[in-house]
């Protein structure tokens, strides 16, 4: 079997297609969660804690060249070591929201699986005719 044929069989299997769809939807869902965190949740958290923009929370760890603006992007471009804990907070909140949503989805799927009626037990198939005849012969020889 040629490599091209093997690859085609592998690529069109249901599991590979399902995985590809899952990755694409997951990427799009990640963008939705990013927007939710950055555009909705973090401004509210910032308002409660007195800061409106968590992305600019940072601690300068080195000397700042003269004339460099005191923004995170400018300091990073200037090569100044900074501890960007605001970005970390945003990413951590992002992760917690995404993990909670996935947890709720898995919980719902498991509940639906438990609610599905169990499949009726399969009835055993009738034995082939030659087996039936052999059993009859065996039983008649025992008598």
UniProtKB/Swiss-Prot annotation:
Per the record, its GO cellular-component terms are: plasma membrane
Give the transmembrane region(s): 10-30, 40-60, 86-106
What superkingdom heads the lineage?
Answer: Bacteria
Q: Which InterPro entries match?
A: Mechanosensitive_channel_CS, MS_channel, MSC/AndL, MscL_channel
A single Pfam family it belongs to is MscL
Q: Which UniProt keywords apply?
A: Cell inner membrane, Cell membrane, Ion channel, Ion transport, Membrane, Transmembrane, Transmembrane helix, Transport
Q: How does it sit in the membrane?
A: Multi-pass membrane protein
Q: Which GO terms describe its molecular function?
A: mechanosensitive monoatomic ion channel activity
Q: Does the keyword Cell membrane apply?
A: yes
Main localisation: membrane
Where in the cell does this protein reside? Cell inner membrane
Disulphide bonds annotated for this chain are none
Give the quaternary structure. Homopentamer.
Q: Which family does it belong to?
A: Belongs to the MscL family.
Protein name according to UniProt: Large-conductance mechanosensitive channel
Origin organism is Paracidovorax citrulli (strain AAC00-1) (Acidovorax citrulli)
């Amino acid at each position: 079997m040629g490599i091209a044929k093997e690859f085609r069989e592998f690529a069109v299997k249901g599991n590979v297609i399902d995985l590809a769809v899952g990755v694409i939807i997951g990427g799009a869902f990640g963008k939705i969660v990013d927007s939710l965190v950055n555009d909705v949740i973090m401004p509210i958290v910032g308002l409660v804690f007195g800061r409106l923009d968590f992305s600019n929370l940072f601690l300068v760890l080195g000397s700042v060249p003269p004339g460099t603006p005191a923004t995170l992007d400018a300091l990073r471009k200037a090569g100044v070591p900074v501890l960007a804990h605001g970005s970390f907070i945003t990413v951590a909140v992002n992760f917690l929201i995404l993990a909670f949503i996935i947890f709720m989805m898995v919980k719902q799927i498991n509940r639906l699986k438990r609610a599905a009626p169990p499949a009726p037990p399969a009835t055993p198939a009738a034995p082939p005719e030659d087996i039936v005849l052999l059993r009859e012969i065996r039983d008649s020889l025992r008598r």
